[in-house]
Design a protein with these regions (language model features):
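Composition- and surface-driven signal marking solvent-exposed, interaction-prone regions
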Residues: 129-131, 194-198
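C-terminal substrate-binding/catalytic lobe of Rossmann-fold NAD(P)-dependent oxidoreductases
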Residues: 40-179
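Glycine-rich phosphate/pyrophosphate-binding beta-alpha loops
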Residues: 105, 184-191
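A generic structural signal for alpha-helix starts
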Residues: 26, 122-123, 189-190
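Structured loop/turn residues at secondary-structure junctions
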Residues: 23, 79, 120, 186-187
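Conserved small/polar residues in nucleotide/adenosyl-binding loops
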Residues: 201-207
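N-terminal Rossmann-like NAD(P) cofactor-binding subdomain of oxidoreductases
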Residues: 1-69, 173, 195-197
Length: 211
């Protein structure tokens, strides 16, 4: 399982089929990786607030899966997500530490992740924001994850090619070890942009390897 910014080194010349996770996993996985590296993580609670898609219903219908068959343009719909398993596959050090949940909301695009962490190391809101700004700017995440203090809303990330955009205004910290982050993402375009980038990398591997 590949998640950009988490385990890119897993791509090889022998990779005939690449499983690319989910848009949620790609939005939050790289952030969890750098936080785990700097502070250590005990537990993660992850809620994706997701725009509806063509797998949702536009009108209430009868059938199995009562919630999923409700009108997506009129309801906030709780649903399950496998993003925790995808992230744990890409970041084995977080295995059995992540609980994930999803809510589909009546917007066609533009989604967000409410990320709550119990850290191993004490910190503060300002320290975490400064660290995330620096690490995103200085390493290979700069074209994958972004950071902003702009007071944005969901429609502002429509068409954004980043996997995720951290909302610095919304960062919270309690008791120096309980952290909340908000991450915005275009649930279609950001994910598609990573697929294109990874596909290009895979295609150029023979050149890089001198084959």
């Amino acid at each position: 399982m590949l998640v950009s910014g988490c385990n890119d080194e897993s791509i090889s010349l022998e990779s005939d089929i690449i499983s690319f996770g989910s848009n949620t996993a790609n939005a939050v996985g790289p952030i969890l990786k750098v936080i785990e590296s700097e502070y250590g993580i005990n537990e993660v609670f992850l809620t994706t607030v997701h725009g509806y898609s063509n797998s949702n219903r536009l009108a209430d219908v009868a059938g199995a899966g009562f919630r999923k068959n409700r009108a997506a343009g009129e309801n906030i719909i709780p649903s399950i997500t496998n993003s925790s398993k995808v992230i744990e596959s890409a970041l084995p050090m977080l295995k059995d530490k992540i609980a994930s949940f999803s809510m589909t909301v009546p917007v066609p695009d533009g989604s967000t992740i409410d990320l709550t962490l119990n850290l191993k190391t004490k910190t503060s809101k300002d320290e975490v924001n400064s660290y995330l700004e620096k690490v995103i700017k200085d390493n290979s995440l700069k074209n994958i994850i972004g950071f902003t203090y702009d007071p944005i809303v969901s429609s502002d990330v429509v068409g954004n090619s980043l996997s995720g955009l951290i909302d610095g205004l919304s960062t919270m910290c309690i008791d120096e070890d309980k952290l909340k982050l908000i991450i915005w993402f275009d649930n279609g375009w950001g994910y598609a942009s990573r697929i294109i980038a990874v596909s290009y990398t895979h295609l150029t591997l023979p050149t890089i390897a001198g084959v």
